[in-house]
């Protein structure tokens, strides 16, 4: 199998190949039922062969990758809660 086309950016985000597309975006699209061709169509910066390698890695390492996705989701939820707690203003809701 070719090496996993993933790199970590300066913020610690795992991105596919030389794109700005996060690994979790590709994985979530695949888990929602989209085939690699549809993912590339939606994100033209991706190469089909890179998406296939990412999907193959996911299928081979499902428990590890699902744990990664849970971690990313948890971090996103914590960030969202932090932002809401700092900037929540009911005046905007009226």
Residue ranges and their predicted role:
Residues 21-91:
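Long, charge-rich, low-complexity alpha-helical segments
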Residues 1-16:
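Short, Lys/Arg-enriched N-terminal segment that forms or immediately precedes the first helix
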């Amino acid at each position: 199998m070719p090496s996993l086309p993933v790199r970590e950016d300066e913020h610690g985000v795992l991105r596919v190949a030389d794109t700005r597309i996060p690994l979790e975006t590709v994985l979530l699209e695949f888990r929602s039922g989209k085939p690699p061709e549809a993912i590339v169509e939606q994100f033209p910066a991706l190469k089909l062969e890179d998406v296939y390698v990412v999907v193959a890695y996911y299928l081979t390492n499902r428990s590890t990758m699902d744990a990664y996705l849970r971690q990313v989701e948890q971090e996103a939820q914590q960030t969202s809660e932090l932002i809401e707690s700092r900037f929540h203003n009911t005046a905007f809701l009226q």
